[in-house]
Swiss-Prot record:
This is 4-diphosphocytidyl-2-C-methyl-D-erythritol kinase. It comes from Mycobacterium marinum (strain ATCC BAA-535 / M). Belongs to the GHMP kinase family. IspE subfamily. It is an enzyme of class 2 (transferase). It holds the Pfam family GHMP_kinases_N. One of its GO terms (molecular function) is 4-(cytidine 5'-diphospho)-2-C-methyl-D-erythritol kinase activity. Transmembrane segments: none annotated. Keywords: ATP-binding, Isoprene biosynthesis, Kinase, Nucleotide-binding, Transferase. The active site is at residues 26, 153. It catalyses: 4-CDP-2-C-methyl-D-erythritol + ATP = 4-CDP-2-C-methyl-D-erythritol 2-phosphate + ADP + H(+).
Length: 320
């Protein structure tokens, strides 16, 4: 557990209210990556899918901006201006002309550097929490604008559900997704840097591989049908080859999940978390148990999707 501030850490929370937000991680069901642009970014076409693995973020009024993180991967995260949640607090305060005098407490379940946009989720949660705590009543379009300034995945953490993302991923269109899909998430033993995975993808393409995905239309149709067996063979991620190149153990994990009974497995985003689509909740339990004993990953979690984006918890608990 760690706590820091931008100068002198406040010893006590200022007891003038709090807001707690739950925010989901995401799986990319489809991710096509364009060639690198002149500005260094890549054009993306992706289908985001929010899943029930959530971080809980509590924001309180305080004397100074501070950040504390506990839970999954907390010891690997900065608790200062390098953290996107801290930047979100500063951006929101700047937007409304106030000092960013809040304490942020993050209880993490989304893996760090896992390809599930955990840092982006926490930033989105801070925006929503401060909007509630300070009774700003900013419209969703303003929150989306601030989210897009923070990063490509932050707008989807606000949006939730299932969405088609274009541009750098920040331009979203809601996708109809019937029924509940069941997932097993396998966390790798170490993280992958998103820039490193993009660099490796560029290198692989320079030598002629990997192949490009077809258009996402069939994926959208399978989601609208609510059929996991129709969706499974359509899951695709052009970054997967690069992630596996950097972490070859992912190949074993992907194979083990399918051998355990999953319909299909995919590296989520830039990795290294592997997401396995299962027919039913019971099948997900079986796959989870077998993966846990296979020695191919650090931790296994069961999740469902789609779920809503960042939302205020009606009766927040007290983070100490």
């Amino acid at each position: 557990m760690s706590r820091t501030s931008d100068g002198n850490t406040a010893e006590l929370w200022v007891p003038t209210g709090s807001a707690t937000v739950r925010v989901p991680g995401k799986v990319n069901l489809y991710l096509a990556v364009g060639d690198r642009r002149d500005d260094g970014y890549h054009e993306l076409t992706t289908v985001f899918h929010a899943v029930s693995l959530v971080d809980e973020v509590t924001v309180r009024n305080a004397d100074l901006l501070s950040l504390e993180v506990v839970g999954e991967g907390a010891d690997r995260l900065p608790t200062d201006k390098r953290n996107l949640a801290w930047q979100a607090a500063e951006l929101m305060a700047e937007h409304v002309g106030r000092a960013p005098d809040v304490s942020i407490f993050i209880d993490k379940s989304i893996p760090v550097a896992g390809g599930m946009a955990g840092g982006s989720a926490d930033a989105a949660a801070v925006l929503v929490a401060m909007n509630s705590l300070w009774e700003l009543n900013l419209p969703r379009r303003d929150l989306r604008m601030l989210a897009a300034r923070l990063g490509s995945d932050v707008p989807f953490a606000l949006h939730g559900g299932t969405a088609l993302g274009t541009g750098r991923g920040e331009e979203l269109a809601t996708v109809l997704s019937r029924n509940t899909f069941h997932w097993v998430l396998a966390f790798a033993r170490s993280g992958l840097s998103t820039p490193a995975v993009f660099t490796e993808l560029d290198r692989l393409r320079d030598v002629g591989s990997p192949p490009r995905l077809a258009e996402p239309g069939p994926v959208l149709a399978a989601l609208a049908a609510g059929d996991p067996e129709q969706l499974a063979p359509l899951l695709g991620n052009e970054m997967q080859a690069a992630a596996v190149s950097l972490d070859p153990a992912l190949r074993r994990a992907l194979r083990a999940g399918v051998e355990a009974g999953a319909l299909a497995g995919i590296v989520s985003g830039s990795g290294p978390t592997c997401a396995f689509l299962c027919r039913t909740a019971e099948s997900a339990l079986d796959v989870s148990a077998q993966l846990s004993g296979a020695g191919v990953c650090r931790t296994v979690r069961i999740a469902t999707g789609p779920v809503p984006g960042a939302r205020v918890v009606p009766t927040p608990g007290i983070a100490e």
